[in-house]
Amino acid sequence: MHYNLCFGTVLAVGNEEQVESMDDVEAHGLLGCFALTEKLAGVQSGLIVQTRAEYDAASQTFKLNNLGATEGAYKNWISQGFVADKAVVLADLTVAGERKGPHAFLMDMRKDGRLEPGVSTGDVRWPRR
């Protein structure tokens, strides 16, 4: 996951700053994950993406969320998700009200071992232990 999907995606489609940030990830022993699968997507992962990314032109930032979507619009079965510091997250991008389809976003999940504000994880094992 870390090298092939997380790093591989950043190296393939990331901008210069994102690619250079991978040196820092390696130097500090940080771990990455790849957040594609959503609960209700099943074998159609990547075709069904309910996580949203909204571009804010004023701040030139993206806000990723799955709030207000259906019950199954959260990332699920993300290998290393419980411990990863960085994540490549697939989200359906909207710019100025126009949907642009699924895009990959590099985001911080944790700093100094603590989840970033707005990031949550949960146990998806069944039955729950």
Regions found by a protein language model. Give the residues of each.
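A short core secondary-structure module
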Residues: A57-V119
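A gly/ser-rich beta-alpha-beta helix-loop segment of oxidoreductase catalytic cores
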Residues: C33-R52
